[in-house]
A protein has these predicted regions:
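Non-heme Fe(II)-dependent double-stranded beta-helix
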Residues: 20, 27-196
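Extracellular structured ligand-interaction cores
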Residues: 84, 168-170, 212-218, 228, ...
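Fe(II)/2-oxoglutarate
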Residues: 1-80, 339-350, 358-398
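Short, conserved beta-strand element in jelly-roll/cupin
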Residues: 162, 196, 202-226, 236, ...
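Active-site-proximal segments of catalytic enzyme domains
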Residues: 185-188, 192-194, 232-252
């Protein structure tokens, strides 16, 4: 039961809603200027985004004091600064990045023969090509290439600067063809995948926390002129607490389109930014350039429970008892909802995006969704078991 769908944003700011959004307040937060004094270790600041020379970072990698200063500066950028940074020349081995790109394009071609194309969370299908879970797929196809590509000093350091150690890397290829239109501006995973009714369920502290659980990034596999549509960014927008609501509102999207910045990127450059930063892939207005990025979504190692609990097993076992108790009036509707929340898996991620494509929505159904539907429609136990087993079967990468 979504008891907070209509909650008012009050109680000393514990609860947020679209009513919490103020474009004037937003402007005061994002219309700032990053300076060399703010980020003295940056080699330059372009369009409000600090730029770093990856070769310098690698040379300093064994100097603990220097690296600690770099990492502290990057953390401040993501926390309350511009929200994005660029590593120039993050992969300088042209043969390596070309070979990895060729392997990923082979995967695209093979998957297209099977699926006909992948969905996208924030753009129309057909405007681009996707490889979900390119991290694992590259590893399995070309382990030596993967080993050289994945062993990247800048990726490790910037990940630890925001998430600490024990981070988890996932990658998703995005190739945008000539004429491919821009995405709508958005925030990203986790809360960027939720609608307003869902966002209202979470206190403001969790709105802050969401961005601390993930770091977004991308490795450029092609030279990207502005005309090819590199990622549009709105510096400092990650600092706006009500931003997950604001990103859904037309006046904020209009403001984004009037004030975003883009940076040209060279093949081998790396871009990293807060998932709460308002951003969107740009329009590829070229006639012949395929914009090719391997996106990185790097997650905190803390995003897990302490114990392994077989919730599918529990759901199937308790369901016939719960159904009988429901029919006999021994469980109220509210008690049934509490039982579902205590028993079944409520979060549908991580998932296999090759199977649970965003063409069918921002998020696939969870175990709780299945259990709720089963209780509502009085499914026989066999049908519930089949649905849960099918759900579990989709929870594999291959």
């Amino acid at each position: 039961m979504d008891r907070l769908k209509s909650v008012s944003p009050n109680d000393n700011g514990v609860w947020l809603g679209s009513e919490s959004c103020s474009l004037d307040e937003f402007r005061t937060m994002v219309e700032r200027k990053a300076t060399a004094a703010d980020y003295p270790l940056a080699d330059s600041i372009q369009r409000n985004v600090p730029i770093y020379d990856a070769a310098k970072i690698e040379k300093a990698a064994n100097d603990c004091d220097s690296i600690a200063r770099y990492m502290a500066e990057w953390h401040r950028i993501f926390l309350n600064g511009p929200g994005a940074l660029v590593f120039r020349g993050m992969i300088r081995d042209a043969a390596l990045i070309d070979a990895v790109g060729a392997a990923l394009k082979e995967i695209i071609a093979e998957e297209r023969l099977v699926t006909g194309g992948k969905g996208d969370h924030f753009a129309k299908a057909g405007a681009n090509a996707r490889v979900w879970n390119s991290h694992e797929k590259l590893c399995m196809r070309a382990p030596e290439l993967y080993a050289r590509y994945a062993a990247n000093e800048c990726v490790d350091l910037v990940s630890r600067s925001w998430l600490g150690p024990l981070y988890q890397i996932t990658c998703q290829v995005n190739v945008v063809y000539p004429g491919g239109m821009a995405q709508v501006p958005h925030r990203d995973y986790h809360m960027g995948f939720q609608d307003e009714a869902q966002l209202r369920q979470y206190p403001a502290t969790v709105h802050r926390l969401s961005a601390a659980l993930t770091l977004q990034g991308g490795i450029s596999h092609s030279d990207m002129s502005i005309e090819s549509g590199p990622t549009k960014l709105l510096p400092y927008s990650q600092t706006y607490l009500a931003g997950y609501f604001a990103a859904l509102r037309p006046e904020f999207r209009s403001y984004f389109e009037e004030h975003y910045v883009q940076l040209p990127l060279a093949k081998g450059d790396g871009l990293f930014f807060s998932p709460a930063l308002f951003h969107a892939a740009g329009t590829n207005s070229t006639a012949d350039v395929e914009r090719f990025v391997n996106l990185l979504q790097i997650g905190s190692g803390y995003g897990r429970s302490i114990e392994i609990v077989d919730r599918a097993r529990m759901t199937k076992h308790v369901y016939p008892t719960a159904l009988t108790m429901q029919e006999e009036g021994r469980l109220t509707p509210r008690e049934l909802e509490l039982l579902v929340a205590a028993t079944a898996e409520g979060y549908p991620f991580p998932c296999n995006l090759d199977i649970d494509s965003p063409l069918s929505g921002m998020a696939p159904p969870s175990q709780q969704d299945i259990m709720r539907q089963a209780m509502s429609e009085r499914w026989p136990s066999g049908r519930l078991n089949e649905a849960i087993d099918a759900y579990q079967a989709r929870r594999t990468s291959h």
